[in-house]
């Protein structure tokens, strides 16, 4: 300390100069620490589990969270309804489903997309539900409409069936494979099932109004105390009026078969042939029944699996198409 109690010259100089400005080395150390913190932050974010999201313009996907550890988890995203319905149509198309002409649908719904997978010859089975009893040696031809809604599906005018129920999922898996589900096979005794599909995934299930129709011509076998309301199928005269103009000569001494033909416009023809008739006779029958197809080039294919009948000189027996469904496809 200087004489008189004042501060020493060196100490006074340090006080007057204030804090020391940071050097270049101090700045480098600060930047390095900042960079390390940023890297740690990014790495911690990248290690977090990510969810795969299936987007749909119609129905948002449902999310579930599954965790096996206190600090980690997995987001499980359930496919949307649109994905389920679109995959169902895609698989059905690959197994022989063909689009129907919207103008031929009785519903008149311009927004719906209708497909048909053709008919199938089914064996006898026990049936608990109400059914029509046809005359001897007649095949039962059952038409069923599968409607796919945003919240489930329904058969004809039946109740809503949610997609997530195991029995319903199994039903749709059979349709994807081009097979008639077992529960539909039980509806008939040695007949055919024609399954149509309609896309209504933009709408929620609409419960139809019950409409009473008087039955005529056929008996009904009841499987329960309360019979179900079943609509009466249209008569053959109303369904296939043009069939009267086509002449197919039948030899009663030769085995016969029943062929159903799904036409390109969505309508159908059903005709009895001898097993000795040729595929060319089937073509001629189509042209005679529907003269508008006479000038069009078309082929005939089996419904499942899809196979073009190229040799039209073969008999129906040789082509192995007895009691089957044929599809007409325009070239």
UniProtKB/Swiss-Prot annotation:
Which residue positions does N-acetylalanine occur at?
Answer: 2
Pull one GO CC term from this UniProt entry: nucleus
User: SEP domain: which residues?
Assistant: 141-206
The answer to keyword Endoplasmic reticulum applying to this record is yes
Region Disordered, annotated ranges? 1-26, 40-65
Instruction: Cite a single Pfam family from the UniProt record.
Output: SEP
For the keyword S-adenosyl-L-methionine, the answer is no
**GO-annotated molecular function:** ubiquitin binding
- Keyword vocabulary terms for this entry: Acetylation, Cytoplasm, Cytoskeleton, Endoplasmic reticulum, Golgi apparatus, Nucleus, Phosphoprotein
Q: What range(s) does the UBX domain occupy?
A: 252-329
**Residue positions of the PTM Phosphoserine?**
56, 66, 231, 234-235
The subcellular localization recorded is: Nucleus; Cytoplasm, Cytosol; Endoplasmic reticulum; Golgi apparatus
Which residue spans traverse the membrane?
none
Which GO BP terms sit in this record? autophagosome assembly; establishment of mitotic spindle orientation; Golgi organization; membrane fusion; negative regulation of protein localization to centrosome; nuclear membrane reassembly; positive regulation of mitotic centrosome separation; proteasome-mediated ubiquitin-dependent protein catabolic process
Phosphothreonine, modified sites: 59
Subunit structure of this entry?
Interacts with VCP. Does not bind ubiquitin.
The family line of this record is: Belongs to the NSFL1C family.
Functional note: Adapter protein required for Golgi and endoplasmic reticulum biogenesis. Involved in Golgi and endoplasmic reticulum maintenance during interphase and in their reassembly at the end of mitosis. The complex formed with VCP has membrane fusion activity; membrane fusion activity requires USO1-GOLGA2 tethering and BET1L. VCPIP1 is also required, but not its deubiquitinating activity. Together with NSFL1C/p47, regulates the centrosomal levels of kinase AURKA/Aurora A during mitotic progression by promoting AURKA removal from centrosomes in prophase.
Q: What is this protein called?
A: UBX domain-containing protein 2B
Q: Which organism is it from?
A: Homo sapiens (Human)
Tell me what gene encodes this: UBXN2B
